[in-house]
């Protein structure tokens, strides 16, 4: 069954942890991204985890292999249950990330999930410099590489999930941002969006939702409504 990940896209730890506290008993996952992590560091990962959530540390590592290996190792030691890298970093970087994942797990006793970013959901067809391939085909090709390199899954839009599952197998996980209840872009920078029901029907395993939950008058109610929509889909 697909799971909801709420994005804590805030500039300060106190605001993020307060929001996570308001969401206890709803979504099983919280996402800590670049803005929050740069403001608060690893302590915010631990603070959110202490509230009973699993934490997706969304830092999209993309650097030389040794640097990524160390960064992933540190991310795991911070208490993250899921981390990610950019697949465009290539095979050596991806395999180094897998090594860092297992090195970090020697401290924590638990191996997190490692995902590879294919194409950002804020990117539309024709916006990738020097790449004329169909964006869906390009994402599926990157995903197949990620599967071969030992990753657990990929970050992709809902539009690529079916082709990725066909190429990589049903057990290869797909995490989908750009989820918008009602299907609207919401006035933000996401381009390739889906409703929760559409994404679950497409086969997504994790749905990332930020502002439609955290910006709602009642965030817990908004999260529960999305989870109910997800649960109603049979696939």
UniProtKB/Swiss-Prot annotation:
One of its GO terms (biological process) is 'de novo' UMP biosynthetic process. It catalyses: orotidine 5'-phosphate + H(+) = UMP + CO2. Pathway: Pyrimidine metabolism; UMP biosynthesis via de novo pathway; UMP from orotate: step 2/2. It comes from the Bacteria. It is an enzyme of class 4 (lyase). The active site is at residue 60. GO terms for molecular function: orotidine-5'-phosphate decarboxylase activity. One of its GO terms (cellular component) is cytosol. Its EC number is 4.1.1.23. Substrate binds at residues 9, 31, 58-67, 121, 180, 190, 210-211. Keywords: Decarboxylase, Lyase, Pyrimidine biosynthesis. HAMAP family: OMPdecase_type1_B. Homodimer. Catalyzes the decarboxylation of orotidine 5'-monophosphate (OMP) to uridine 5'-monophosphate (UMP). Belongs to the OMP decarboxylase family. Type 1 subfamily. This is Orotidine 5'-phosphate decarboxylase. It comes from Nitratidesulfovibrio vulgaris (strain ATCC 29579 / DSM 644 / CCUG 34227 / NCIMB 8303 / VKM B-1760 / Hildenborough).
């Amino acid at each position: 069954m697909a799971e909801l990940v709420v994005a804590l896209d805030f500039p300060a730890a106190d605001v993020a942890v307060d929001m996570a506290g308001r969401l206890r008993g709803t979504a099983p996952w919280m996402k800590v991204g670049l803005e929050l992590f740069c403001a608060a560091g690893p302590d915010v990962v631990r603070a959110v985890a202490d509230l009973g959530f699993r934490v997706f540390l969304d830092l999209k590592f993309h650097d030389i292999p040794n640097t990524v290996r160390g960064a992933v190792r540190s991310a795991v030691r911070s208490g993250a249950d899921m981390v990610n890298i950019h697949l465009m970093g290539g095979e050596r970087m991806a395999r180094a990330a897998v090594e860092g994942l297992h090195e970090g797990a020697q401290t924590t006793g638990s191996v997190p999930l490692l995902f590879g970013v294919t194409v950002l959901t804020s990117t539309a067809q024709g916006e990738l410099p020097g790449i004329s391939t169909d964006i869906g085909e390009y994402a599926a090709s990157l995903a197949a590489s990620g599967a071969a390199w030992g990753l657990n899954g990929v970050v992709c839009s809902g539009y690529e999930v079916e082709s990725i599952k066909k190429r990589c197998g049903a057990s290869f996980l797909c995490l989908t941002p750009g989820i918008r209840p009602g299907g609207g872009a919401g006035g933000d920078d996401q381009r390739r969006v889906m409703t929760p029901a559409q994404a679950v029907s497409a086969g997504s395993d994790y749905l990332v939702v930020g502002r439609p939950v955290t910006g709602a008058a009642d965030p817990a109610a908004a999260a529960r409504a999305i989870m109910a929509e997800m649960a109603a889909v049979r696939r």
